[in-house]
Amino acid sequence: MPEAPGPAPAALPARGTLLAFDFGLARIGVAVGELETRRASALLTLHGEASAPRFAAIAKLLDEWRPVGLVVGMPSHLDGTPHEMTARCRRFANQLHGRFGLPVLECDERLSSAAADAALAEAGTHDWRARKQVLDAVAAQIILQHFLDTHGHAKP
């Protein structure tokens, strides 16, 4: 069965905030970035599997940060074929668009968690418990930085 397409891509303004999500069944990593500066930062990790509290927390983040768009990491295998989580991530992207009405853009997230783990180890976070607490937010940062580096506007 073919996958349902994600939300239609939308043009983004030259300035404004983006929030990015590294969607997982137990955790969602969140990062924030600015279109003008083209820089992303890890923000936080949402914990729990229940949909209502997740979307309530996301609504609070949207109210606080007032983003002009959202980016959702889309997993795939190294050869580009869909990952078992691809359809769930696309559904999450569609739910974000439907609930909040903001442009939602998809971004390849291949190896983002591995890159996040390596970056945390290099930064001196060797305790696996401490790394696990921030891993998803750093993965979201990597996804958003990749998006900012490869999409849209010229760097200042």
UniProtKB/Swiss-Prot annotation:
InterPro entries named among the record's database cross-references: RNaseH-like_sf, YqgF, YqgF/RNaseH-like_dom, YqgF/RNaseH-like_dom_sf
Keywords, in A-Z order: Cytoplasm, Hydrolase, Nuclease, Ribosome biogenesis
Compartmental location: Cytoplasm
Signal peptide coordinates: none
Enzyme class: hydrolase
Chief place where the protein resides: cytoplasm
Record-listed E.C. numbers: 3.1.-.-
SMART domains: YqgFc
Pfam family name, one: RuvX
Listed GO CC annotations: cytosol
GO BP term (any one): rRNA 5'-end processing
Superkingdom as given in the UniProt entry: Bacteria
GO molecular function: nuclease activity
Family per record: Belongs to the YqgF nuclease family.
HAMAP family assigned to the protein according to its UniProt record, in alphabetical order: Nuclease_YqgF
Task of the protein: Could be a nuclease involved in processing of the 5'-end of pre-16S rRNA.
Protein name, entry field: Putative pre-16S rRNA nuclease
